[in-house]
A protein has these predicted regions:
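Surface-exposed amphipathic alpha-helices with a cationic face
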Residues: 40, 158-162, 236
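N-terminal positively charged helical leader segments and presequences
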Residues: 1-84
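Short beta->alpha connector loops at strand-helix junctions that form conserved
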Residues: 24, 50, 71, 98, ...
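Active-site/ligand-binding-proximal alpha/beta "capping" segment
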Residues: 169-224
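RNA substrate-binding interface of SAM-dependent RNA methyltransferases
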Residues: 11, 17, 83-177
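Short, glycine/polar-rich helix-capping loops at beta-to-alpha or helix-loop-helix junctions
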Residues: 31, 128-134, 197-206
Length: 244
């Protein structure tokens, strides 16, 4: 698979995932030095091409002058998220995506989840954008550090999580429960629905609680990735306060 963009490529190099590295002639020297250092550590040589050749390879000009070839991305397992939570000594926190089909939203949610401290992002096989180069670029390297899990049946996973003591909160604009009213200091899965349709009825019914983000403006709703970032930050902030 080809990935592109400076942050995703650097993270892939640092994670020893890159098999070939394609660089555009004339990119700035500061980034070239950083790229050369990371490539040297990873044992990969830089291959120089005219920028138009890179444009053709990924069918976009938005590659920032660097493309990397990596093995096809394998999805993680739920156990990988459990292990990450255990390694940090934290209660499990998963972000479940129900129908996020826009790759930019998907990538942005992965990025927010990794940066803010969630332990994994879970998607359903037939109701999600694929883990594509656009997603990887938008995630800005976060896919190298955060388990991204794909399941066949999200409602079934929710049942299994609940059986294991995980609480499931769903984001819903019409929910009466507000952010500050819920307990986040427990094993938790947060479900984010699509911008157009929200959560499916079956997913909604399986949630222990539905939560909304208070708004004051005239626009009805937030972008899915923005809403996810706010909710993820709320969970992590609540847990940090609990530690003090």
């Amino acid at each position: 698979m080809l990935i592109y963009g400076r942050n995703p490529v650097l993270e892939a190099l640092r994670d020893n995932q890159v098999t070939r590295l394609f660089v555009a002639d004339g990119i700035d020297s500061k980034f070239t030095k950083e790229l050369e250092a990371a490539a040297f550590e990873s044992g990969v040589e830089l291959e120089w091409y005219a920028r138009i050749e890179l444009d053709r390879a990924v069918k976009t000009t938005n590659h920032q002058g660097v493309i990397a070839e990596i093995p096809e991305t394998d999805f993680a397992e739920i156990d990988d998220a459990l292990e990450l939570a255990a390694a940090r000594g934290e209660e499990l926190f998963l972000v479940l995506l129900d129908g996020i089909t826009d790759p930019h939203n998907f990538g942005a949610i992965i990025r927010s989840a990794e940066v803010l401290g969630a332990h994994g992002v879970v998607i359903e096989e037939r109701r999600s954008a694929p883990l594509s180069p656009v997603v990887v670029k938008t995630a800005a390297g976060a896919t190298a550090h955060l388990p991204v899990v794909q399941v066949k049946n999200l409602p079934r996973l929710i049942d299994e999580l609940k059986e294991d003591g995980v609480w499931v909160y769903g984001a819903a604009g019409e929910a009466t429960a507000k952010l500050e009213q819920l307990d986040y200091n427990r094993p938790l899965a947060l479900v984010i629905g699509s911008e157009g349709d929200g959560l499916r009825r079956l997913v909604r019914e399986k949630c222990d609680e539905l939560v909304s983000i208070p708004t004051k403006g005239k626009v009805q709703s937030l972008n899915a990735s923005v809403a996810a970032a706010i909710l993820i930050h709320t969970v992590i902030s609540s847990r940090e306060r609990k530690k003090k």
